[in-house]
Each structure stands twice: as structure tokens, then as C-alpha cells.
Amino acid sequence: MRLQFPEGFLLGVSSASAQIEGGEVGSNWNDWYHQGRIKDDSDPAVADDHWNRWREDCALMAGLHLPIARMGVEWARIMPARGEIDETAIAHYRAELEYMRQLGIRPLLTIHHFSNPMWFERLGGFSKRENLDDFLSFAKLCADRFGDLVSDWITINEPNVYATNGYFFGDWPPGHKSFSETLTVLENMAFCHIRCYQMLHATREAMGYSDTMVGFANHLRVFEPENPKNPMQAATARAVEWLFQGAITQAMSTGVFRLPLKNHWKLPKGEYCDFHGVNYYTRSTVTGFADGVRKNSPRNDLGWEIYPDGLPQVAAKLEKLLKRPIWVTENGTCDNQDAFRARYIYEHLHAMLRSGLPFERYYHWCFCDNFEWLEGESARFGLINVDYATQTRTIKRSGEFYADMIRNDGVTDEAYNTYVRGEVYRVE
């Protein structure tokens, strides 16, 4: 055996409703497309048409022998107007969740994954404290309607990416460029997570369940100075890491708000995650307050460095913050020809499992090629190829490798030689 998985270790896949479902649902990403802001002009109303093909996609998951899968629900579908509930949408999601369970797939449900209804966006979204009850009402509705089918929950996906891209750099909706507003959004999302954590446990406990697991998925990367001997660059790297991921991770995990975040609600210190959710993709080199990529490093098709050792590095910091099991809630790569994805997956799993850290789950991003936010459909991360003209699904070579790992509870020598050996990264 080339790589043996520890007992109980699970492999799964991740997806997000706005990236796969399709449909003109009145979300901020539908609006962003109509403003002409998607690089390849892909329309999220098309995406993978998962809303109409969910049975086919769930059957594909079962065909890969997946025991777990992460999915989301689209707020704009469930609440198309403020205070309005679409019971048809709720019934649709319940049917999908029930079918997953029938197939032996345990769902991990994400409540918020970058997508807002436009009515919420027009009110100021998460930048306005008076709007937070709207999100908390949606979260409570999810708990009430799906709590009997879902034990594992992610409250908010990548609050740091949502806030910085939408409110600091202005590349994502709503397109603002304000440091103070970015901090406000982060503070408000931390508040929402803590309230959701408490609510989800209370709601499911009232239903008679004691197996609730709640966390959040944060985007974590390694920040290193371009020149390790340069003290200014080293200090800047530490500052960027804290501003981008350290402060928000601590606030949401423990209720401890430290600069630049403030605890305006006087929330009590506590423990507000049952697992550490890690979304890891790359390492960034730092000279100033902008990302860089180390020279002569392996890169994916978006130019991101491929750095497997960074995954246990970021996870180790979470372990020091709070002793919890670690779930890799996203890890994957843009590989449009599926030329090195199997190697990428193998090397990240190898780095994780040799670390000795309490990794319990690995959710590959993503299940099938999808609408990859600003990049559109041109950036392919999936184990399943999607022909967007016909919506035909085809299992990629990397998907076959993934299924083989699940069947064998690890990577056999034969699988390594068949799928991993010979795959080569592009180096720049």
C-alpha cells in the first residue's frame, strides 16, 4: 500500500449551490453577470443545471463510492423576497438531501456560500448590523426544515474571501473598496456564525438529536516573505496573515475579537466550532500587501503555486488555537486538461496524513466542473467533466483515481502507478 488511510478517515466532495444549480434566481451573482463582470462572460444561470439534474449528479457521487458530500442551499431560492418563503424550493432541497442519504452519502450543508438575494444586497447586506436578523432567520429556517436530515453544518464559507473580494478589492459583488467596511463585514459575519452555532445545536437538540457538528470553512493559505532574510517582508507577511485569516478565525472559533476586529456585541468567550473547516489551495509570497508567487514553483492553470506542505502548516495553527478534529472542507486545483490533478490530490493527502494532526475528512473541490465565480466556467476544478453545451457529465481520470482510493481505503501501488506516476506540474 502506497498510502494507507487511518481508520475512520473519509473522502468526499464539495460544491456550492450558486456554482452548480443554474437558474435566474435573483442573486448577487446573477446581477454581477448582468453587469458584465465575469471574465469569460459565463452565465451562472446556466452553470451545471444541477437544479434539474440533481438525481443524475447524486447517482454519479454514489458511483464514485462517496460516503460524504458537501452541498449548499441558495438563499435567493428559498427566500425570494424579504419575509417570503418558497416552500417548493424547500421541498426540492429536502428531496435531494433524502436521496443522498438513501445512497449512503452523508451531507455537510453550507448555509452561506458567497451568494445573497438581491433584496438583501440592496439593503446593504452584511455591512449593516440591522440586516443580520434577515440572515439569522434564513439560517433558522434551514435548521428547522433540514435539521432532521442534516447533522453536519457549515454556517459561513470563507468569510475572509467574501469580505476582502467584495468590500476591499471590489472585484466581487457588491464591488466596494473600503477597509473599514471590510472589517465591519467580518465582524458581522463572526457574530452571525456564533449565533448560528448556538441556534443549530439548540434546534437539533430540541428535535432529539445529539450528533450535531457545526463549524465554518475558512480560506487559509501560507504567507511567506519573498526574501526570508528581509525583516520588513517577514513582518509584512505576519501582518497580512493576521489581517486576512488569523483574526477572523480566532473570533469565529473562540469569540475572542482582537485587532483589527472588535466585539461590538460583547459576545462571551467560548468554543464555537465542533471541527476546524479548512479550505486550502496555495501559498503566497509577500513583499507588500499583495499576493505573489514564488519563482520556479509548480503552478496550476490559474497560476497558483502548488504547495502540499502548506496544508498541514495552516492546520497546525488551528490545532494550537483549539483542539478539534480537522475537516478539509475544500482542496483542489484548476487543471483544465486533468493532467496533474491525481498527483495534486495524492501529494496533499500524503502531506496531511504524515503530519500526525487529527485530520478526519477530506472534501475535494470540486465534484464537477462549475461556475468558478469571477473566472466563470473556464477554470475547471472538477473530478467530473461537464460539457456546458450539452450538460453531459464524464468521469475524469482523476475521478477514477478518487473512487479507487475510496474503495481501497488508501492509495495502492497499482493506483499510484496508474494515475499518479508520470503526472508533471508546470513550473514557472
At which residue positions do the language-model features occur?
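Non-catalytic scaffold segments within catalytic domains of secreted glycoside hydrolases
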Residues: M1-W54, C58, A62-P67, A76-E428
